[in-house]
C-alpha cells in the first residue's frame, strides 16, 4: 500500500524475484482503495504515472477528509478534468478552488438547491412555486460553468489555482523507486582463501615501550 518506504517497495520486489541483478520491467495496472474511502482516480492517468509520483499522491491524499475526497472524485469527472498526475496532487493544495454540492446531480436538483435551500434567492414562496426548477438549474449551471457528476455538482469558487507540484520533481522523502540488491545466501558465498605467510617472513612482535611517568 502507499504511501510506502523504499524498504517496503524493495521487499515487494524481492518477493517476485525483481532485484538489481534482475531488473525486470513492471507495469501499473490500476489501484485499489478502502471500502470506506472510495477514491475515483482516472485509471489511465494512474497507469501512466511513475511510482514516485503515485507515492507522493498517496501521501497527499491522506490530508483530505471525507468531504475533500468527495470533491476530488467530482473534480475528476468534470468537463475539463485533470490532465496529469501533477494536477491531481495539486488539488490537495487547492481544495477551496471548487464548491462541491454532493447532493445535486442534475439541473432540477440544482434549481431546487439554489431556489429553496441555499438562501441565495429571496422571494415569496408562491413566486418560487411558479419557477421551472429544471430550466432554472440548467441556466445556473450554464452561467457558472458547473459540472454535474456521479459524485455531485462542482463549480469553481473564484479562488486562484496555485501550482505546488505540477512540473516539479517529487520531494526526496517520497522517492522510493529503485531496485533492491540481491540477497546472497551464506552457503553460496565464495570461500575466502587465507594466504599462508612463511615463518621466515612473519613479523616479530614489536617490543614493548615502557611509559615513563
Q: Where are these predicted regions, by residue range?
A:
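Acidic, low-complexity, intrinsically disordered interaction modules
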Residues: 117, 123-135, 143-145, 149
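Ordered hydrophobic segments in well-structured contexts
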Residues: 1, 25-29, 145-156
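A generic structural signal for short, solvent-exposed coil/turn residues
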Residues: 20-22, 146, 203
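Non-Sec secretion/translocation targeting segments of pathogen effectors
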Residues: 132, 182-213
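Mixed-charge (acidic/basic) macromolecular-recognition segments
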Residues: 12-129, 156-183
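Short, extreme N-terminal segment that most often corresponds to the first beta-strand
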Residues: 1-6, 210-213
Amino acid at each position: 500500500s502507499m504511501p510506502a518506504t523504499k524498504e517496503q517497495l524493495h521487499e515487494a520486489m524481492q518477493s517476485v524475484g525483481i532485484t538489481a541483478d534482475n531488473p525486470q520491467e513492471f507495469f501499473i495496472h490500476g489501484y485499489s482503495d478502502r471500502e470506506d474511502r472510495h477514491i475515483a482516480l482516472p485509471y489511465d492517468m494512474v497507469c501512466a504515472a511513475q511510482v514516485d509520483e503515485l507515492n507522493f499522491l498517496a501521501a497527499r491524499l491522506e490530508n483530505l477528509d471525507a468531504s475533500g475526497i468527495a470533491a476530488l472524485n467530482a473534480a475528476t469527472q468534470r468537463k475539463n478534468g485533470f490532465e496529469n498526475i501533477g494536477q491531481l496532487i495539486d488539488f490537495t493544495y487547492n481544495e477551496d478552488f471548487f464548491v462541491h454540492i454532493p447532493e445535486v446531480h442534475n439541473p432540477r436538483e440544482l434549481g431546487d438547491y439554489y431556489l429553496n435551500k441555499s438562501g441565495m434567492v429571496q422571494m415569496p414562496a408562491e413566486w418560487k412555486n411558479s419557477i421551472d426548477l429544471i430550466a432554472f438549474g440548467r441556466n445556473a449551471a450554464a452561467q457558472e460553468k458547473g459540472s454535474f457528476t456521479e459524485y455531485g455538482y462542482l463549480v469553481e469558487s473564484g479562488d486562484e489555482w496555485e501550482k505546488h507540484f505540477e512540473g516539479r520533481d517529487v520531494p526526496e522523502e517520497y522517492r522510493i523507486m529503485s531496485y533492491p540488491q540481491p540477497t546472497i545466501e551464506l552457503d553460496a558465498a565464495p570461500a575466502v582463501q587465507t594466504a599462508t605467510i612463511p615463518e621466515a617472513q612473519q613479523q616479530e612482535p614489536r617490543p614493548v615501550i615502557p611509559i615513563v611517568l
